[in-house]
Every structure is written in C-alpha cells, then in structure tokens.
Amino acid sequence: MITKDSIETAYAFLHQKLRVYEHSTLDWQKDDIEMIIGDYADQINPELLSMLSNGRPDYLKDHKKFQDDITHAVAVLENIL
C-alpha cells in the first residue's frame, strides 16, 4: 500500500537531492547523490517505486538515465501530492 507519508517522504528527499544535483558543478558531488539515491531506491516503498519506475529494475540506478529518472520521479510525486 502506498501511503501519503511514503509519497511525502520520497518527494522531499528526491526534490532536495535533485536541486543540488542540477546546480552542482562537482562531479564527485553528483556521483555521491547518484549513489545515495540508488541506495534509497532499494529502501523505498516497493509499490511506490514500481509505480514510478513502470517496473524498470535500474530506475534511479543507471548513471546514464539518472537525471531523467530523478526529474521524472519528482514530477510524478509532485502531481500526486
């Protein structure tokens, strides 16, 4: 079951990290954010992650798609709130 609390928590965390990621000029900082979000994706409500990812197993974990994934996740969560 996807709770309002899990949506709000995911949105707050991902939104904050996205803003830092977008404005960062430091590769190591971006890499750290990708690693943190990848770890978070392993702990997020499984139903919420499935809804966001459309079942894609590498969602929020693929370096090449990371910025698109996190931007998508924040937009979807924002629309739900």
PLM region spans:
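Short terminal alpha-helical segments
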Residues: 1-28, 74
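Short, charged, amphipathic alpha-helical segments
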Residues: 8, 27-39, 63-71
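Charged, low-complexity interaction regions
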Residues: 19-31, 45, 56-63
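Amphipathic alpha-helical interaction surfaces
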Residues: 20, 39-47, 76-80
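Charged low-complexity stretches with an acidic bias
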Residues: 53-81
